[in-house]
Amino acid sequence: MDVAIIGGGAWGSALYKALLEKSSVALVSRSGREGIHQCSLQEALEARFLVLAIASSALRGWLNEANLPPKTKILVACKGIEEGSGALVSEILEEFLPRENLAYLAGPSFAKEVREGLPCALVIHSHHLELAQEMSQFFPSWIRLYVENDVVGGEVCGAYKNVIAIAGGICDGLGLGYNAKASLVARGLVEMARFGQYFGAKIETFLGLSGAGDLFLTSGSTLSRNYRVGLGLAQGKSLEEILIELGEVAEGIKTARAITQIAQREGIHAPIAHEVNAILQGKNPKESLKDLLSHGR
């Protein structure tokens, strides 16, 4: 077996179908699915590498239970910042595995389009570029892959853009227009970069596929769960209602809280994340966006 994918959600299933074109693949999932080759975790460890496509909030618990051998190679396909500790996904993983065996998938990609075989370009970030290059060989030709070593930058982009996507959904849901939306997304990119640079990320990462590419995609389409969270909030729905309708995890909710905590602790200016978190805690969306778009913020 070439690749074993951990997690049978939308993203894990899409990656399974894509990788199957060129590689032998199995899926480790709690629920059985017709037409999908599934295996146990023990069997998955025989693969060349694992693709981790579980919710970032479940990552630490899964790693504690899995007890992976140190030689395990992982391509991480989940995005987020741990609430409470403020740890990036890479920081959590490096508590369990050597960093030279870890790589991180980033870039603009909706699961639905990947599942349909539509072309896209992604980035594999890793401290060990040879590992990233090796993993890229198992993807089909219609997924263009680049390799980069800015792990922190790739992670911050992947996590933060979900928060900006919620703001984008709110902006569109309130009918504030294209001018306001462009301002919000552009400022969101600057805010992401400022946060990432504080932790040593490269500015170039935020201008490429992992940053601007993923942000522009996610903040303007109903294919984005986080964007739909924002739309729902603007329409007056409760967060509980929205999550029931989604039926899936929207990582931006917990990430907004984590970023706000880190920004307050470290003195980082993060007004969009702050307002999104306030809205998620019950603040009026219209009032929040008015505050954000007015002079002085």
From Swiss-Prot:
It comes from Wolinella succinogenes (strain ATCC 29543 / DSM 1740 / CCUG 13145 / JCM 31913 / LMG 7466 / NCTC 11488 / FDC 602W). It catalyses: sn-glycerol 3-phosphate + NAD(+) = dihydroxyacetone phosphate + NADH + H(+); sn-glycerol 3-phosphate + NADP(+) = dihydroxyacetone phosphate + NADPH + H(+). The active site is at 161 (proton acceptor). Sn-glycerol 3-phosphate binds at residues 79, 107, 109, 161, 214, 224-226. It is found in: Cytoplasm. The keyword Cytoplasm applies. NCBIfam families: PRK00094.1-2, PRK00094.1-4, PRK00094.2-1. It is an enzyme of class 1 (oxidoreductase). Pfam families: NAD_Gly3P_dh_C, NAD_Gly3P_dh_N. Belongs to the NAD-dependent glycerol-3-phosphate dehydrogenase family. GO terms for biological process: carbohydrate metabolic process; glycerol-3-phosphate biosynthetic process; glycerol-3-phosphate catabolic process; glycerophospholipid metabolic process; phospholipid biosynthetic process. One of its GO terms (cellular component) is cytosol. Catalyzes the reduction of the glycolytic intermediate dihydroxyacetone phosphate (DHAP) to sn-glycerol 3-phosphate (G3P), the key precursor for phospholipid synthesis. InterPro entries: 6-PGluconate_DH-like_C_sf, 6PGD_dom2, G3P_DH_NAD-dep, G3P_DH_NAD-dep_C, G3P_DH_NAD-dep_N, NAD(P)-bd_dom_sf. Its EC number is 1.1.1.94. NADPH binds at residues 11, 30, 79, 111, 225, 249, 251. PANTHER family: GLYCEROL-3-PHOSPHATE DEHYDROGENASE, GLYCEROL-3-PHOSPHATE DEHYDROGENASE [NAD(+)] 2, CHLOROPLASTIC. SUPFAM superfamilies: 6-phosphogluconate dehydrogenase C-terminal domain-like, NAD(P)-binding Rossmann-fold domains. Its main location: cytoplasm. The keyword Transmembrane helix does not apply. Keywords: Cytoplasm, Lipid biosynthesis, Lipid metabolism, NAD, NADP, Nucleotide-binding, Oxidoreductase, Phospholipid biosynthesis, Phospholipid metabolism. This is Glycerol-3-phosphate dehydrogenase [NAD(P)+]. Pathway: Membrane lipid metabolism; glycerophospholipid metabolism. GO terms for molecular function: glycerol-3-phosphate dehydrogenase [NAD(P)+] activity; NAD binding.
